[in-house]
Amino acid sequence: MMSILWSLAAFIVALGILITVHEFGHFWVARRCGVRVERFSIGFGKALWRRTDRQGTEYVIALIPLGGYVKMLDERVEAVAPELRHQSFNNKTVLQRAAIVSAGPIANFLFAIVAYWLVFIIGVPSVRPVIGDISPQSIAAQANISSGMELKSVDGIETPDWDSVRLALISRIGDKQMQVGVAPFGSDNVVEKTLDLRQWQFEPDKQDPVVALGIIPRGPQIESVLAEVQPGSAAQKAGLQAGDRIVKVNGQLLDRWQTFVLQVRDNPGQPLVLDIERESTPLSLTLIPDTKSVGENRSEGFAGVVPKVIPLPDEYKTIRQYGPFTAVYQAGDKTWQLMRLTVSMLGKLITGDVKLNNLSGPISIAQGAGLSAEYGLVYYLMFLALISVNLGIINLFPLPVLDGGHLLFLAIEKLKGGPVSERVQDFSYRIGSILLVLLMGLALFNDFSRL
């Protein structure tokens, strides 16, 4: 219950910040263009707080924090006194109106740059992209990539950490091939490798794109030695103790801890014969994994043990931290990468290269907000930057109810020398609203199906 409330609070704070930034962009440019702003509202519904400034603008914080708006003087909406017509939105030039409309998304992009600038000033801990292992017959194996190598770049984009690698990989979904630069760890002798992506299939919301290529990142070393056996668990009932080393499972030599995890997961309620070592003494025990439900008509095995973990050596860790000026460039570059990724993913949703079930809605965003806030300020800022970029790009989509739709009408007006008829605009708004509701419905359906 507390985690739900925490996620909800982090989501509301994030939404409030991003909506305020977006609407302030519209507000600020409207004021600079001489448009009278009547109301600046964060949220919808009943006003919880309101204040009016000297220029007659009413500032409102409303009950429902799921949006916001800037109400400008406009003769198309209501009658305007003759002495105020020059302050009406509809009486401004096409370029001025386009500037006002596009200012919201631009504000979101600028906010992302500021957020990442703070991240890089504070410093973000990360792990260098060193390969721990390569899965046999995988895409990476076929490209002759081997363990111990460090991924230096993906299609020319530098990858100083695993997050950068994943960001670059996701944008390549649907491509036929990809170039990666690799070098032995600690070396700058970079070799370019070509990966054949025609058989590369994975679901971004469920799978790691790195692992889907057959690359297993170098991480903390997990030994097949038990650090803890939970009381009352299947492992304790089988006689396992902390300090036991698992050597074989059903007669097969255990090469890595993950193999044991998969054996337990895939055999709920089924006996597994374990050969173990306890203080150098060989023993044989039978483990019957407990059964836990993980969805409709699906269950997994659960043993109730924790393995011994040897932390990752310091030479594999890094902190991305820069001075004030370098951080500006890095923040801009990171924001540009996110913008390209968002546009690419939206395009691939349309072409079918990415399945529609990868679309996320407010529940997934709330979960992400709560999780990032738990990790700390740096990760919450990174989350805000990501959502801010997404909000900016989506608002530029040419749907009439979005900023992009308004820009489309203004472009048509500029080309034809007159505004689009109100009848056409009204019809377009209806169609756009229906499409937006359908998309939101699909996103919510995907959210609930992931719970």
UniProtKB/Swiss-Prot annotation:
<dbReference type="GO" id="GO:0046872">
    <property type="term" value="F:metal ion binding"/>
</dbReference>
<dbReference type="InterPro" id="IPR036034">
    <property type="entry name" value="PDZ_sf"/>
</dbReference>
<feature type="transmembrane region" description="Helical">
    <location>
        <begin position="427"/>
        <end position="446"/>
    </location>
</feature>
<keyword id="KW-1133">Transmembrane helix</keyword>
<keyword id="KW-0378">Hydrolase</keyword>
<dbReference type="Pfam" id="PF17820">
    <property type="entry name" value="PDZ_6"/>
</dbReference>
<keyword id="KW-0862">Zinc</keyword>
<feature type="binding site">
    <location>
        <position position="22"/>
    </location>
    <ligand>
        <name>Zn(2+)</name>
    </ligand>
</feature>
<keyword id="KW-0645">Protease</keyword>
<dbReference type="InterPro" id="IPR004387">
    <property type="entry name" value="Pept_M50_Zn"/>
</dbReference>
<keyword id="KW-1003">Cell membrane</keyword>
<dbReference type="InterPro" id="IPR041489">
    <property type="entry name" value="PDZ_6"/>
</dbReference>
<feature type="transmembrane region" description="Helical">
    <location>
        <begin position="377"/>
        <end position="399"/>
    </location>
</feature>
<protein>
    <recommendedName>
        <fullName>Protease RseP</fullName>
        <ecNumber>3.4.24.-</ecNumber>
    </recommendedName>
</protein>
<keyword id="KW-0479">Metal-binding</keyword>
<feature type="transmembrane region" description="Helical">
    <location>
        <begin position="98"/>
        <end position="120"/>
    </location>
</feature>
<dbReference type="GO" id="GO:0005886">
    <property type="term" value="C:plasma membrane"/>
</dbReference>
<keyword id="KW-0472">Membrane</keyword>
<keyword id="KW-0677">Repeat</keyword>
<feature type="domain" description="PDZ 1">
    <location>
        <begin position="115"/>
        <end position="186"/>
    </location>
</feature>
<dbReference type="InterPro" id="IPR008915">
    <property type="entry name" value="Peptidase_M50"/>
</dbReference>
<comment type="similarity">
    <text>Belongs to the peptidase M50B family.</text>
</comment>
<comment type="function">
    <text>A site-2 regulated intramembrane protease (S2P) that cleaves the peptide bond between 'Ala-108' and 'Cys-109' in the transmembrane region of RseA. Part of a regulated intramembrane proteolysis (RIP) cascade. Acts on DegS-cleaved RseA to release the cytoplasmic domain of RseA. This provides the cell with sigma-E (RpoE) activity through the proteolysis of RseA.</text>
</comment>
<comment type="subunit">
    <text>Interacts with RseA.</text>
</comment>
<dbReference type="Pfam" id="PF02163">
    <property type="entry name" value="Peptidase_M50"/>
</dbReference>
<feature type="binding site">
    <location>
        <position position="26"/>
    </location>
    <ligand>
        <name>Zn(2+)</name>
    </ligand>
</feature>
<feature type="domain" description="PDZ 2">
    <location>
        <begin position="199"/>
        <end position="280"/>
    </location>
</feature>
<keyword id="KW-0812">Transmembrane</keyword>
<dbReference type="InterPro" id="IPR001478">
    <property type="entry name" value="PDZ"/>
</dbReference>
<keyword id="KW-0997">Cell inner membrane</keyword>
<keyword id="KW-0482">Metalloprotease</keyword>
<feature type="active site">
    <location>
        <position position="23"/>
    </location>
</feature>
<dbReference type="GO" id="GO:0004222">
    <property type="term" value="F:metalloendopeptidase activity"/>
</dbReference>
<dbReference type="GO" id="GO:0006508">
    <property type="term" value="P:proteolysis"/>
</dbReference>
